[in-house]
Amino acid sequence: MPIVIEQSARGERAFDIYSRLLKERVIFLVGQVEDYMANLVIAQLLFLESENPDKDIHLYINSPGGLVTAGLAIYDTMQFIKPDVSTLCVGQAASMGALLLAGGAAGKRYCLPHSRIMIHQPLGGFQGQASDIDIHAREILAVRDRLNKILAHHTGQPIEKIQIDTDRDNFMGGDDAVSYGLIDKVLTHRTVTAA
């Protein structure tokens, strides 16, 4: 893990790179969305809210997706906390990663030029007694409907279009994701603020 040395009036302080970025209100969501990673992201969101509830949080996403329950825990926290959560796809935001990208604050959802975004219906499998398979089949259909409603809410697309478009893997580049309503803008360079 890279270490960053910061100079201050009190001397030097060493940070791992992610801790240093957290100090700037940047959270990285990288890799599979699973329970441990979700807990870390949620803890960082809550910590940054407690530090300053009025300042935006920046969530950088590079994820192939993962567990629906873990992803929805992150999503619910993003919606629950007071600060706006700006989302930025760097690399890919697929499946649950795409839902989290779309769940950023309106007007503050971005991707870089060569990012790849993919939406689809939830995946699942189960074996066991027929009655248990039936229970799990109904549950995955209910989860699919819940995820489609979230996407419809954040994209402005009709639920019927979301249902069709998520029936199979649906890949988009940045411009297509803007047109679809998953993000607000493709960023090609960082804006420079006047001194």
UniProtKB/Swiss-Prot annotation:
* InterPro entries in UniProt: ClpP, ClpP/crotonase-like_dom_sf, ClpP/TepA, ClpP_His_AS, ClpP_Ser_AS
A biological process term (GO) from this entry:
protein quality control for misfolded or incompletely synthesized proteins
Keyword Membrane listed: no
One Pfam family in the UniProt entry = CLP_protease
Keyword ATP-binding assigned to the entry: answer is no
Catalytic residues, chain numbering: 95, 120
Q: What class of enzyme is it?
A: hydrolase
Enzyme Commission identifier(s): 3.4.21.92
Protein's cellular compartments: Cytoplasm
Reactions listed under catalytic activity = Hydrolysis of proteins to small peptides in the presence of ATP and magnesium. alpha-casein is the usual test substrate. In the absence of ATP, only oligopeptides shorter than five residues are hydrolyzed (such as succinyl-Leu-Tyr-|-NHMec, and Leu-Tyr-Leu-|-Tyr-Trp, in which cleavage of the -Tyr-|-Leu- and -Tyr-|-Trp bonds also occurs)
Provide GO CC annotations from the record. cytoplasm; endopeptidase Clp complex
Cite the entry's keywords alphabetically.
Cytoplasm, Hydrolase, Protease, Serine protease
Gene3D superfamilies, per this entry? Answer: 2-enoyl-CoA Hydratase, Chain A, domain 1
GO MF entry, a single one: ATP-dependent peptidase activity
Q: List the disulfide bonds.
A: none
What is stated as this protein's family in its record? Belongs to the peptidase S14 family.
What interactions and quaternary structure are annotated?
Fourteen ClpP subunits assemble into 2 heptameric rings which stack back to back to give a disk-like structure with a central cavity, resembling the structure of eukaryotic proteasomes.
Quote the HAMAP family the UniProt record gives: ClpP
State the function annotated in the UniProt record. Cleaves peptides in various proteins in a process that requires ATP hydrolysis. Has a chymotrypsin-like activity. Plays a major role in the degradation of misfolded proteins.
Name under which the protein is recorded: ATP-dependent Clp protease proteolytic subunit 2
Can you name the source organism? Methylococcus capsulatus (strain ATCC 33009 / NCIMB 11132 / Bath)
Q: What is the lineage of its organism?
A: Bacteria, Pseudomonadati, Pseudomonadota, Gammaproteobacteria, Methylococcales
